[in-house]
């Protein structure tokens, strides 16, 4: 390109006054001084001095190229005419491919090393043909390899033996969860499950968790009849089961998260009862009931006091169990 700007034409023809800027133009010009037609058609008498002209002829008539000739007229088997390629000029066949024997000359007793040739097509294709359509199964395209099966079969057995072991820990965790949820029901007195619509069917785990919620909700209201750490029996429930509370208990299945707050309120109630030992038992129980009713609807995380149990329970449901301030 710079030679065109500078007007320099260093390539001169030895037979005439022609000069050009590159070697390829000079080679094309030298063909005009020769009578040898290097590129010929194998299906007809067409012959030309230029490779591009032969490609156009082969594309137009669907013919095949003949062997390329040298500048002196001798045949040259190395160049390959790529009819539909975009590269200008003939392709050069590598010397190693020309001098390789076509027939199988290796000894049968010696194992052949793995070569990147296809097992069916042999040396005709130097690659494994990734574009081959998957019309045949894998066993028909490739010969069986016992070493590969022996290497992969122990791993398959190990995977099959490890699967039951991997499945067993979730089963044990499930049994622990079921035993944990069934333990309060066995220890306490028998009571009917909370009311729920007959159309809704739930699993045993989800059916038992509202009862735990009912026991823990009792810790907030009936603190005068329960000791620290032991939930009162369900028969002494103070708040009646209304459709609103039944729906709320079914929706909120993790009410046992409020147990630390209930224990803290129970300890405060015990301290107040110890301080008022001179009063009668009826007066002490009334004061404890009134104080617990005033403080049982308070969120210990947000310092918010609610007017009734419904709003307090809905609010406490938004606090996480591990992290109360994480939604």
UniProtKB/Swiss-Prot annotation:
Q: Where found, per UniProt? A: Nucleus
Tell me which species this is from.
Answer: Manduca sexta (Tobacco hawkmoth)
Q: Which GO BP terms sit in this record?
A: regulation of transcription by RNA polymerase II; segmentation
- Using the UniProt record, give the first listed, main subcellular location: nucleus
Q: Where are the zinc fingers (C2H2-type)?
A: 1-5, 11-33, 39-63, 297-319, 325-327
GO terms of molecular function: DNA-binding transcription factor activity; RNA polymerase II cis-regulatory region sequence-specific DNA binding; zinc ion binding
The function of this protein is: Gap class segmentation protein that controls development of head structures.
- Protein name, as recorded: Protein hunchback
């Amino acid at each position: 390109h710079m030679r065109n700007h500078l007007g320099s034409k260093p390539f001169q023809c030895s037979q005439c006054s022609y000069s050009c800027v590159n070697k390829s133009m000079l080679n094309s010009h030298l063909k005009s001084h020769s009578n040898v037609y290097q590129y010929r058609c194998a299906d007809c008498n067409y012959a030309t001095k230029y490779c591009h002209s032969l490609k156009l002829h082969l594309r137009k008539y669907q013919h095949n190229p003949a062997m390329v000739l040298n500048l002196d007229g001798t045949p040259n088997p190395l160049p390959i005419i790529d009819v539909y390629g975009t590269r200008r000029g003939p392709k050069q066949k590598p010397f190693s491919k020309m001098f390789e024997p076509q027939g199988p000359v290796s000894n049968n007793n010696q194992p052949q090393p793995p070569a990147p040739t296809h097992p069916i097509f042999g040396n005709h294709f130097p690659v494994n043909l990734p574009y081959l359509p998957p019309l045949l199964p894998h066993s028909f395209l490739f010969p069986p390899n016992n070493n590969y099966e022996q290497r992969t079969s122990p791993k398959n057995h190990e995977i099959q033996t490890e699967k039951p072991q991997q499945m067993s820990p979730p089963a044990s965790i499930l049994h622990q969860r079921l035993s944990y949820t069934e333990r309060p029901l066995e220890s306490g007195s028998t009571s009917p499950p909370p009311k729920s619509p007959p159309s809704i069917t739930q699993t045993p785990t989800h059916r038992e968790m509202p009862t735990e919620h009912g026991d823990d909700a009792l810790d907030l209201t009936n603190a005068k009849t329960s000791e620290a750490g032991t939930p009162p029996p369900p028969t002494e429930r103070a708040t009646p089961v209304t459709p609103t509370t039944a729906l709320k208990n079914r929706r909120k299945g993790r009410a046992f998260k409020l147990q630390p707050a209930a224990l803290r309120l129970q300890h405060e109630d015990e301290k107040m009862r110890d301080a008022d030992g001179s009063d009668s038992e009826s007066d002490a129980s009334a004061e404890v009931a009134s104080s617990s009713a005033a403080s049982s609807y308070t969120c210990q995380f947000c310092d918010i006091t609610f007017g009734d149990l419904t709003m307090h329970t809905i609010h406490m449901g938004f606090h996480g169990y591990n992290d109360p301030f994480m939604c």
